[in-house]
Amino acid sequence: QGYSSAASDVYKRQAVILAAGSGRRMNTPVAKQFLDLMGIPVFLHSVRLFDKIADKIVLVTSPDAVEYCQNLLEKEELCAEVIVIAGKSERFLSSMEGVRAASDCDLIMIHDAARACVDMEVIERSIASARIHGSGVAAVPLKDTVKVADQNGMVLSTPDRSTLRIIQTPQTFKHDIICAAYDHLNHIIETKGIKAAGSITDDAMVVETFTNQKVYLSEGSYENIKLTTPEDMTAAHGILSARTREL
């Protein structure tokens, strides 16, 4: 794989990279995962990094972008097997498709392509936690005080900040755990409809809700930002530029 570390061993690892979002808050005609960042599309930053540590990469993108991504990836000199599949209307449905496409592995790393500034240390910590606990979800402590408020803006409570974490990706799970979680979720959707699934915002929530497994967090990074607004693109350019200068 071309990368030597404590996480690089006989464990078979596959990555599911989610690049199917519309990115409406970016206010651009092009979806955020295809915007130019340091000379390449946003999603390609994650593909290149996970290629150093994954045996297989499943890129989940919008149906109309599958061919574009395939053509782009064919020009890349990647070590991992890479497949591109069409995603769905909801993130968790796209993630479920990605997990289904992953096979014959010990660990599945699920990552949002919009987090183009993720670094190898964050990925390795996620893997290390998953090997021990079955899950490793990148997270960082809150820096700010958080308030719970009603629709009128009246404060209802102030949670203890020390117990709260901002959740990121990658989210790494043992293959059997994440597959069982999504199988259970899929059964509920097929029998009761998609509304019965509730509001699912990440893969850890699927494991929390649809299995009896405990979810464990791993140390993320404040640089591992999610590209959501134009300001985030500026910040990401600064982060990646600084790393380039350090090399």
Which ranges hold each PLM region?
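Residue-level signal for inorganic ion chemistry
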Residues: 17, 43, 98, 111-112, ...
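Conserved beta-loop-beta/alpha segment of the NTase-like Rossmann-fold superfamily
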Residues: 89-149, 168
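Single conserved hydrophobic/aromatic residue that forms the stacking wall/gate
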Residues: 1-11
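N-terminal glycine-rich phosphate-binding loop and ensuing alpha1 helix
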Residues: 12-66
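Residues at the starts of beta-strands that form the adenosine-phosphate
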Residues: 55-57, 134-135, 214
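Conserved N-terminal catalytic core of the sugar/cofactor nucleotidyltransferase
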Residues: 8, 43-105, 186-191, 195
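Short, flexible, basic/aromatic active-site loop/helix in glycosyltransferases
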Residues: 148-173
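Conserved alpha/beta core of the MobA/IspD/sugar-nucleotide pyrophosphorylase nucleotidyltransferase superfamily
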Residues: 165-247
